[in-house]
Amino acid sequence: MTRPLLSPEWVARLKQFKKLIVGFSGGLDSTVLLHVLASTPPLYNQLLAVHINHGISGNSLNWQRHCEQLCLDLGIAFIAKAIEFDRSANVEEAARNARYDFFSSLLEDNDCLVLGHHLDDQAETVLLQLFRGAGVDGLAAMQECSNLGAGQLARPFLTCPRVELEHYARIHELKWIEDESNQDTKYSRNYLRHRVMPLLLEKWPGVAGNISRAATHCQQAKANLEVLAIKDCPDLLNATDHLLIEPLKGLEFERITNVLKFWLKKNRVQLPSSKTFQRIIHEIIFAKLDAMPTVSWNQIQVRRFQQHLYLLKADQINLPKAIKWQQFPASLTYPDANIELSAVKAQKGLMIPKDAQIEIRFRKGGEEIYWHDQTKHLKKLFQEWQIPPWLRERVPLVYINDQLACVVGYAVSDLFFTTNPLEAWSIVNNS
């Protein structure tokens, strides 16, 4: 008697979610996953199948129709999404990132994305990471459960060999898509699957399970390193885009690197090379107190100001010259630069004259604001407020009829200040 693909423990775990979003490519893995979930009564009403159309193959539309028909047959809600991504470099990675970005956008609180990755996929992932010279994080490969967006990601088949999925599909007479690109060995994973793994399995039949078990050991090591990082630098618990430097100076370099990795992962930043970590330690952490060095990689910057490290992403570097706030008081968003401002009623604050022209600008130099009965240079105020120099350019400035009326989060010009709660607004920077 074969074991069920979905254990009672997994059923209980998945049952707690409000919605189960199934990544449904139409291939063997996701077809079996969807059928298993649809055949589990406690989970059926939570299911939503999502098919990502990458538009790479000429068969893409036929595959989408196949997936839609199967969902219709099973009575499961279905969404198809065509995605755009950069095809000039690593197509596999770009497609994967675009796919996960869309999945993440669908997830709300207490939702779960369920994917059909199995034990053979895990073994391949470990080997690919090994060949790239990955550390513990990379060799930990895929986790059964992890956070994604506002929800969770689950891989209930991660301990199941592909042959068990094939057996299930045959018994239930399931039809699935065979993507012709899966045979193309120019892709690293396909080369590993078709050329390398057969040789390893010939010599060691249980090698996929052994490799997968190594990933589990690395996941435990990764968790232990995260505990150590927090012990070494308690500021990590509350750190966002800045991190206190002083606790790091008494640590060995390897432990400083461990803290930095935890901090960058917390900010969803791709980790740099070992050489870059060495540069951050030598050139920034142990720099002179008055120095303001920068280390960059992949449109990411780490900088220093006084006693903190600061992390800047690409969307924090490239800012527009001005944004008209035409729908005030509705929130203002500018995704390309990660800008989101909202206006809330206040007891005292910014007064917006009737028919005023409201515009958001950013510091270029020479700005002045009439504040506390004086005309003050913005540069001087930023120094008094101890705002890091590179962050000063990101502070939104509210201009009303071409006059600087508000430095968001810091000051409102006397010319536009009111204590009348019927007229007062507070501008909140949600970026």
From Swiss-Prot:
<dbReference type="GO" id="GO:0032267">
    <property type="term" value="F:tRNA(Ile)-lysidine synthase activity"/>
</dbReference>
<dbReference type="InterPro" id="IPR012094">
    <property type="entry name" value="tRNA_Ile_lys_synt"/>
</dbReference>
<dbReference type="InterPro" id="IPR015262">
    <property type="entry name" value="tRNA_Ile_lys_synt_subst-bd"/>
</dbReference>
<keyword id="KW-0819">tRNA processing</keyword>
<dbReference type="Pfam" id="PF11734">
    <property type="entry name" value="TilS_C"/>
</dbReference>
<keyword id="KW-0547">Nucleotide-binding</keyword>
<keyword id="KW-0963">Cytoplasm</keyword>
<dbReference type="InterPro" id="IPR011063">
    <property type="entry name" value="TilS/TtcA_N"/>
</dbReference>
<dbReference type="GO" id="GO:0005737">
    <property type="term" value="C:cytoplasm"/>
</dbReference>
<dbReference type="GO" id="GO:0006400">
    <property type="term" value="P:tRNA modification"/>
</dbReference>
<dbReference type="InterPro" id="IPR012795">
    <property type="entry name" value="tRNA_Ile_lys_synt_N"/>
</dbReference>
<comment type="similarity">
    <text>Belongs to the tRNA(Ile)-lysidine synthase family.</text>
</comment>
<keyword id="KW-0067">ATP-binding</keyword>
<dbReference type="GO" id="GO:0005524">
    <property type="term" value="F:ATP binding"/>
</dbReference>
<dbReference type="Pfam" id="PF09179">
    <property type="entry name" value="TilS"/>
</dbReference>
<feature type="binding site">
    <location>
        <begin position="25"/>
        <end position="30"/>
    </location>
    <ligand>
        <name>ATP</name>
    </ligand>
</feature>
<dbReference type="InterPro" id="IPR014729">
    <property type="entry name" value="Rossmann-like_a/b/a_fold"/>
</dbReference>
<dbReference type="InterPro" id="IPR012796">
    <property type="entry name" value="Lysidine-tRNA-synth_C"/>
</dbReference>
<keyword id="KW-0436">Ligase</keyword>
<protein>
    <recommendedName>
        <fullName>tRNA(Ile)-lysidine synthase</fullName>
        <ecNumber>6.3.4.19</ecNumber>
    </recommendedName>
</protein>
<comment type="function">
    <text>Ligates lysine onto the cytidine present at position 34 of the AUA codon-specific tRNA(Ile) that contains the anticodon CAU, in an ATP-dependent manner. Cytidine is converted to lysidine, thus changing the amino acid specificity of the tRNA from methionine to isoleucine.</text>
</comment>
<dbReference type="Pfam" id="PF01171">
    <property type="entry name" value="ATP_bind_3"/>
</dbReference>
